[in-house]
Amino acid sequence: LRSTITFSENKGAYKGSLLTRLQSLCNGINGMIFVADEIPKEQLFEENVIVDLSRVGSSETKSLIMGMMVLKLQEYRMSSATGMNAELNHITVLEEAHNLLRRTSNEQSAEGSNLLGKSVEMLSNAIAEMRTYGEGFIIADQAPGLMDMSVIRNTNTKIILRLPDQADRELVGRAANLNEDQITELAKLPC
């Protein structure tokens, strides 16, 4: 930590903020995830498993945990692959996917690159690439307008339920190649 912080003006604030964030990942339910004994990868990625993050406090921590799990899944699939274009043998469901795959600006700030945008792009690419290893994904969300466009474009089958918001209807309707009348009907679907 000392060797990575080179600027002196905000060094104390930066260090304190970073240490506080790291400590929060080692307390309570987060501590059980990051510090306790690991579940074997085979059990986590080959069997039926539910990862319930409802008790994780902040959305940022949920996103971090979900992102790390998707990347670990990608590593596991790549290392255990017997070839390319494998048949579907496992499905991962990402519920409330906007927590992980949120639409971000492509703009770069004066401080440097868009870190959040790059991480969403990296995860979206990982999800797309895992199909060749037999991994399928169900991306579920009630607010498609919050999700990154690449996620919507890279899904083949779309199941659309009632969408009261016009912007969501337009977005999903265009992605599913619906006509104007069909897009209008999305607001009238039963709940």
PLM feature segments, named:
Residues 110-111, 118-191:
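Conserved ATP-driven motor cores of ASCE-family P-loop NTPases powering translocation/secretion/packaging/pilus
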Residues 1-128, 132-135:
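P-loop NTPase motor domains
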